[in-house]
Amino acid sequence: MAWASRLGLLLALLLPVVGASTPGTVVRLNKAALSYVSEIGKAPLQRALQVTVPHFLDWSGEALQPTRIRILNVHVPRLHLKFIAGFGVRLLAAANFTFKVFRAPEPLELTLPVELLADTRVTQSSIRTPVVSISACSLFSGHANEFDGSNSTSHALLVLVQKHIKAVLSNKLCLSISNLVQGVNVHLGTLIGLNPVGPESQIRYSMVSVPTVTSDYISLEVNAVLFLLGKPIILPTDATPFVLPRHVGTEGSMATVGLSQQLFDSALLLLQKAGALNLDITGQLRSDDNLLNTSALGRLIPEVARQFPEPMPVVLKVRLGATPVAMLHTNNATLRLQPFVEVLATASNSAFQSLFSLDVVVNLRLQLSVSKVKLQGTTSVLGDVQLTVASSNVGFIDTDQVRTLMGTVFEKPLLDHLNALLAMGIALPGVVNLHYVAPEIFVYEGYVVISSGLFYQS
């Protein structure tokens, strides 16, 4: 049912799934998240409590008198969720029911206040998704009140009707909540699906172990597995599991997400294996400001001018043979790229001729951001680009002079290409229609923390 699915999504805010064996990510939902769920969960809960009341059978007269009773409205003025340390989440709700009793000589409206209490335990399924179960549920109903005190219905009959209604609610409301939880479990089972990273790559999250619950938060150890062409990206086993310290990020935030060095290493290895970091840099030969031609190179390298008396196009083939390295230090995130750059010129027969090749080291400042459900990044060059001549078919090369040219024709295309890749982003742990809002990102030694609010878009 639609309302069950929506309420399931709301409750799933408590359980952002992810993981495999060694946790590379920790997701912590704080008290503020429970407050948010409590507020937006009232309307779906009201719809869930709209149960059917069977006819009341009146045996007091000479003949059996069936009386139809219908719930006109359910209003939930208060819904409160709280963490129970070492256990799960407790639900406390106050609901006001309005009933219409179709009784001669005229219908009667009654109101009945009800207090609901349910304790939920969160465990782990065999497919590494959360499983929510109701361990205890009870309700406490108050005294029913008539809307119109002038109604001629006898007090004795009202007592019997009220007893009938309370008995029905005692049987049905906890069952209704239990059915909602089952709907939540069906929904959570879909969270092991793959989220696209690129055209041929995906990320999958799954839980590592049973959640840890304290009086302040619920913490899930999760692992992100990246796939390229259906095959997982495997890193060397790290004997030290990632542990998110207790007091990190912004106090009072709804969600605290810790991303280990392992996740960044996997993402960069994925980009390198996919060849996504490779690029060819070319220029427009007839452009006045084009420096990617043999004339510009010939002014720096005499042998190029001798071999190419007429200006010919030059191509820089940039290949990443070594995996980029992310370095996470307090308040500082950097990337190191070590591309191999081959410089080729187009000969008169349109074939490419290798002029020389360079081993390059580029250090980049990494700025992280979050957009809705994705972690994104932008880079800028940090310091000077380091060049070493790997091979040359044009004699001696003065790397100091070539460095000036490379800074003009190499850095900007490389940054544009890399930033376009990082802008695609990588999906963070979450559920359908749930977005991170007003996130703050903190870089610590060996890990990154995202402190964020949450917004559910229905």
Swiss-Prot record:
Protein encoded by which gene: BPIFB2
A single cellular component GO annotation: extracellular exosome
Disulfide bonds: C137-C174
SUPFAM superfamilies: Bactericidal permeability-increasing protein, BPI (SSF55394)
Range of residues in the leader sequence: 1-20
Listed Pfam families: LBP_BPI_CETP, LBP_BPI_CETP_C
Modified residues annotated as Phosphoserine in this record: S60
Name of this protein: BPI fold-containing family B member 2
Expression across tissues: Highly expressed in tonsils, especially in hypertrophic tonsils. Detected at very low levels in fetal liver.
PANTHER family, sorted: BPI FOLD-CONTAINING FAMILY B MEMBER 2 (PTHR46019:SF1), BPI FOLD-CONTAINING FAMILY B MEMBER 4-RELATED (PTHR46019)
Family listed: Belongs to the BPI/LBP/Plunc superfamily. BPI/LBP family.
Annotated effect of mutating A20V: In a colorectal cancer sample; somatic mutation
Origin superkingdom: Eukaryota
Gene3D superfamilies associated with the record: Bactericidal permeability-increasing protein, domain 1 (3.15.10.10), Bactericidal permeability-increasing protein, domain 2 (3.15.20.10)
